[in-house]
Amino acid sequence: MELKNELCTVLEQIKEKTPLVHHITNYVTVNDCANITLAIGGSPVMADDHKEVEDMVSIASAVVLNIGTLNERTIESFVLAGKKANELNIPVILDPVGAGATAFRSQTIEKILKEVKLSVLRGNMSEIKNIYGTGTQTKGVDSVDSSLDGGKEIAISLAKKLSCTVVITGEVDIVSDGNKTYAIQNGHKALSSITGTGCMSASLIGACCGTGKGILQGAILGTMIMGIAGEKANERLKVHEGLGSFKVYLMDAVSNFDQDDIRKRGKVDEI
C-alpha cells in the first residue's frame, strides 16, 4: 500500500507540473511517443539536431533516448543530450531498441553507456540480456527470448553495474534499482502486436521520472500505466474491432488514467 501511495503522488505531480520530456527517438513511433506523453499529462519535445539538443535539455524535466532508427547524426545528439542532462541532474532514460541486432547498434549502446550516466534502462528480455552480456540473439527489434528465468538476477546485477534502474518488459515486467526489485503483472498480449508500445513506455517513464519524486517509483509507474492501459483497451474491444481500435483505446486509457487505476488495478509486488 505504501508503494501505491508513492505512485499516486507521482501521478499527481505529473498533472501539476506537466514535465517537459525531451525525446531523441526514432521516426517510426515519434508521433505515438509525443501523444502518449501528452495523454498522461506531460509535455513532449522531439528535437534531435546536435546544434540545439543541449539547449533543449536545459529546459527539460527528463530525457528519453531511443535508438530505434540509428544514424550518425543522432548518435552525436544522444551523447550531447545525455551529458548535458547529467550535468543538470536531469533523469536520462535509454531504450536500447534492437540491442544486439547489428554491430553498429551494439557499438552505439556501448558508447552511450560509457559517456552518459543513465537513470533508467528499459528494454525487453533479449535487449537487456544482450547488454548484460549473455549473448542472447536479437532478431530485428523483436524479442526472441521471452523466458523470465533469471530475469530478476539480471535486472539486479545490471542495475548495480550501471548504477541505474533497470526495467525488463515482458509477460511479467521486472523493475530493479539493485536494492529493491518489483514484478508488475499488468498488461495484455495485444500490446506486443502494435508498433511502439515499448517506445511509449519509455516516454511514460520519462514523464513519471520528470516529477522528481523518485526514479524507481517513476519506472514502476510508467511501466504499470502501459500495462493497465492495455488491459482496459482490450476490455473495450467489440467483436468486430481489432488492433486499430485497440491502439485508439490504449491512448484513451492513458489519458483517463487516475489514482483508482493504481490502487484497484495495479499488480505490483516486491520480489
Curated annotation (Swiss-Prot):
Give the pathway annotation.
Answer: Cofactor biosynthesis; thiamine diphosphate biosynthesis; 4-methyl-5-(2-phosphoethyl)-thiazole from 5-(2-hydroxyethyl)-4-methylthiazole: step 1/1
TM helices/strands, residue ranges: none
One term of GO molecular function:
magnesium ion binding
Q: Its catalytic activity?
A: 5-(2-hydroxyethyl)-4-methylthiazole + ATP = 4-methyl-5-(2-phosphooxyethyl)-thiazole + ADP + H(+)
Binding of ATP, residues: R122, T169
Q: Where does substrate bind?
A: M46, G196
Q: Which residues form a coiled coil?
A: none
Q: Where does the signal peptide begin and end?
A: none
Per its UniProt record, the required cofactor names are: Mg(2+)
Enzyme Commission code(s) on record? 2.7.1.50
Database matches in SUPFAM superfamilies? Ribokinase-like (SSF53613)
Q: Which GO terms describe its biological process?
A: thiamine biosynthetic process; thiamine diphosphate biosynthetic process
Keywords (alphabetical) are: ATP-binding, Kinase, Magnesium, Metal-binding, Nucleotide-binding, Thiamine biosynthesis, Transferase
Query: Its family?
Result: Belongs to the Thz kinase family.
Q: Which NCBIfam families match?
A: PRK09355.1, thiM
Job of this protein: Catalyzes the phosphorylation of the hydroxyl group of 4-methyl-5-beta-hydroxyethylthiazole (THZ).
Q: What is this protein called?
A: Hydroxyethylthiazole kinase
Q: Gene symbol? A: thiM
